[in-house]
C-alpha cells in the first residue's frame, strides 16, 4: 500500500474486510483507484481469490470430496469481492500487470493485493523516495487471516536432447550442498521461500530484513495453492467475472 496516501486520508492499514472496503472507497479519487485487484479470467485471479474464499470458511470441496461451492459462505465471500469492481474502486484494465508493484509506485492505486514477488521492486522504489508498506491480507472480523502459497519448479523433459546436463544444472543451482546459488536466487534474483528448510535456517537474517520480515511473520498462515480440474477453474473464473 501507498503509506503516504493512507496517511493523507487518515486511514490505518486495513486489518478486516470492512476496513479494506472502507479504505478502498475513501482512497478512490478521480485520479487514483483505491485498490488493484486482478480482473481477467486467469489463474492469477484465482490465486488472489482463494484466500478470501478460505477466510470465510468456504471451499470448492469438503474433506470428503463433496462439492461445497454452493454454500452460503461462498456467496458471502463473492458478495464481498464483487463491489470492488462494481463500485469502481479498482481499475477494469491495467497497463502493468496486477502482479506489478508499479501500480502503487506510479499512482494507479493506493493499495494492491500482492506477494513476495513484489518485495525487491518495492524496496527499490522506497530507496527512491516512495513509501510502500505491506500488511497481511485483511480477514473477516473475528476470523483468522489466511494467505496462499504458490511456487515455481524446474523440471527436465524426458524428450530433452540434454537430459543429464539439464538435471545437473538444476541440482547445481538448487540441490547442492553449497547453498550460495539457491540463496541468491531466492533473495536477489527475486524473493521467495526456498523449498529446502536448511537454506532458510542458514540465512535466517536475510528472511528478517525489511519487508521480508513481515512476510516471514505470517508465513505460517499460508495454504498451498489448490490444483483443480480445468472444469472447476473455468466455472470459478466465470463466477468471478
Regions found by a protein language model. Name each.
Residues 23-28, 64-94, 137:
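Glycine-centered hinge/linker elements that transmit conformational signals in sensory
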Residues 15-22, 92-106:
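Short helix-initiation/N-cap motifs at beta->coil->alpha
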Residues 18-67, 82, 109:
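Extracytoplasmic/periplasmic solute-binding protein
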Residues 117-129, 140-238:
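C-terminal lobe and pocket-closing loops
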Residues 5-6, 25-26, 98-112, 238:
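Short helices/loops that flank or line small-molecule/ion binding pockets
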Residues 8-13, 63-66, 82-96, 108, ...:
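A local structural motif
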Residues 1-13, 38-63, 148-156, 232-240:
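Periplasmic solute-binding protein
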Residues 110-115, 133:
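Paired acidic/hydrophobic, glycine-rich loop segments that form the ligand-binding mouth/hinge
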Amino acid at each position: 500500500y501507498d503509506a503516504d496516501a493512507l496517511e493523507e486520508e487518515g486511514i490505518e492499514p486495513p486489518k478486516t474486510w470492512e476496513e479494506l472496503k472502507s479504505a478502498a472507497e475513501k482512497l478512490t479519487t478521480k485520479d487514483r483507484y483505491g485498490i488493484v485487484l486482478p480482473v481477467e479470467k486467469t489463474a492469477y485471479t484465482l490465486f488472489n481469490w482463494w484466500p478470501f474464499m478460505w477466510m470465510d470458511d468456504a471451499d470448492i470441496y469438503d474433506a470428503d470430496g463433496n462439492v461445497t461451492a454452493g454454500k452460503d459462505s461462498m456467496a458471502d465471500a463473492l458478495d464481498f469481492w464483487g463491489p470492488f469492481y462494481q463500485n469502481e474502486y479498482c481499475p477494469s484494465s491495467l497497463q502493468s500487470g496486477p502482479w506489478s508493484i508499479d501500480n502503487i509506485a506510479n499512482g494507479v492505486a493506493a493499495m494492491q493485493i500482492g506477494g513476495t514477488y513484489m518485495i525487491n521492486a518495492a524496496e527499490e522504489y522506497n530507496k527512491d523516495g516512495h513509501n510502500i508498506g505491506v500488511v497481511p491480507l485483511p480477514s473477516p472480523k473475528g476470523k483468522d487471516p489466511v494467505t496462499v502459497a504458490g511456487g515455481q519448479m524446474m523440471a527436465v523433459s524426458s524428450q530433452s536432447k540434454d537430459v543429464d546436463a539439464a538435471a545437473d544444472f538444476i541440482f547445481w543451482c538448487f540441490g547442492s550442498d553449497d547453498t550460495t546459488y539457491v540463496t541468491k536466487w531466492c533473495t536477489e534474483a527475486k524473493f521467495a521461500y526456498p523449498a529446502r528448510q536448511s537454506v532458510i535456517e542458514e540465512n535466517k537474517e536475510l528472511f528478517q530484513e525489511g519487508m521480508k520480515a513481515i512476510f516471514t511473520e505470517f508465513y505460517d498462515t499460508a495454504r498451498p495453492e489448490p490444483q483443480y480440474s480445468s472444469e472447476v477453474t473455468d466455472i470459478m473464473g466465470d463466477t468471478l467475472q
